[in-house]
Amino acid sequence: MSLLTEVETYVLSIIPSGPLKAEIAQRLEDVFAGKNTDLEALMEWLKTRPILSPLTKGILGFVFTLTVPSERGLQRRRFVQNALNGNGDPNNMDRAVKLYRKLKREITFHGAKEIALSYSAGALASCMGLIYNRMGAVTTEVAFGLVCATCEQIADSQHRSHRQMVITTNPLIRHENRMVLASTTAKAMEQMAGSSEQAAEAMEVASQARQMVQAMRAIGTHPSSSAGLKSDLLENLQAYQKRMGVQMQRFK
């Protein structure tokens, strides 16, 4: 796996699924391929994205700044600086300085990542802030190692939280989660169907599914009534793909 592929993987792992994630993935691909060289426009686009947490925006801004060639005097962006200040906690800053001293002696991506993984996400973000504000200088490989370690820490906590929701025995939470997943799947079906004539059936199925979820929420239904909703939708989507000559069995 190449270095940039690894960085893209880690960064995307902390972004919630949805159309915005697909858009960010495309921007990262373009940046890493050298196709997007306007850092100013890229940062302005990032700043105005909804949903993303300030820290996620800070990490993406840091990655874009590391990758896109820019003029020496280009101003640092406040939204990135604020996100990478470790919540203003002096303990985070102290640890960040210690980490930075270790990273300065490191030259490899994996070496930097290993060192960084023993620190908290707050200290890692503060260390990124030091480098972003030009208060510290490390090689690009080492900076990317720091980015990936930070993303791994965040993804771990997101995974624990997600697992708690998945294994919860509360029927109301499970019911709502199934309806949310069904609704999201329906939206994805509508996007994939596009505007071809054959797409009418897939669009109809997706539209009916979304209406059903809205009705279930409006009238209040038994928690077991949502069981299988998402699976039914995916079966319809795969049947549609088969007719279109596309064989993809990886949605479940």
UniProtKB/Swiss-Prot annotation:
Subcellular location: Virion membrane; Host nucleus
UniProt KW RNA-binding keyword: yes
InterPro entries: Flu_matrix_M1, Flu_matrix_M1_C, Flu_matrix_M1_N, Flu_matrix_M1_N_sub1, Flu_matrix_M1_N_sub2, INFV_M1
UniProt keyword list: Host nucleus, Membrane, RNA-binding, Viral matrix protein, Virion
Ranges spanned by the short sequence motif Nuclear localization signal, renumbered to the chain: 101-105
Transferase found in the keyword field: no
Membrane topology note: Peripheral membrane protein
Disulphide bridges: none
Gene Ontology terms, MF aspect: RNA binding; structural constituent of virion
SUPFAM superfamilies, sorted: Influenza virus matrix protein M1
GO cellular-component term (any): membrane
Positions of the UniProt region annotated as Membrane-binding: 1-164
Organism domain of life: Viruses
Start and end residues of each stretch annotated as RNP-binding: 165-252
BP-aspect Gene Ontology terms: viral budding from plasma membrane
HAMAP family associated with the record: INFV_M1
Other facts noted in the record for this chain: Most abundant protein in virion. When expressed alone can form virus-like particles in transfected cells.
UniProt function note: Plays critical roles in virus replication, from virus entry and uncoating to assembly and budding of the virus particle. M1 binding to ribonucleocapsids (RNPs) in nucleus seems to inhibit viral transcription. Interaction of viral NEP with M1-RNP is thought to promote nuclear export of the complex, which is targeted to the virion assembly site at the apical plasma membrane in polarized epithelial cells. Interactions with NA and HA may bring M1, a non-raft-associated protein, into lipid rafts. Forms a continuous shell on the inner side of the lipid bilayer in virion, where it binds the RNP. Determines the virion's shape: spherical or filamentous. Clinical isolates of influenza are characterized by the presence of significant proportion of filamentous virions, whereas after multiple passage on eggs or cell culture, virions have only spherical morphology. Filamentous virions are thought to be important to infect neighboring cells, and spherical virions more suited to spread through aerosol between hosts organisms.
Family the entry assigns: Belongs to the influenza viruses Matrix protein M1 family.
Complex and partners: Homodimer and homomultimer. Interacts with NEP. Binds ribonucleocapsid by both interacting with genomic RNA and NP protein. May interact with HA and NA. Cannot bind NP without genomic RNA.
Name assigned to this protein: Matrix protein 1
Taxonomic source organism: Influenza A virus (strain A/Leningrad/134/1957 H2N2)
Taxon lineage: Viruses, Riboviria, Orthornavirae, Negarnaviricota, Polyploviricotina
Gene of this entry: M
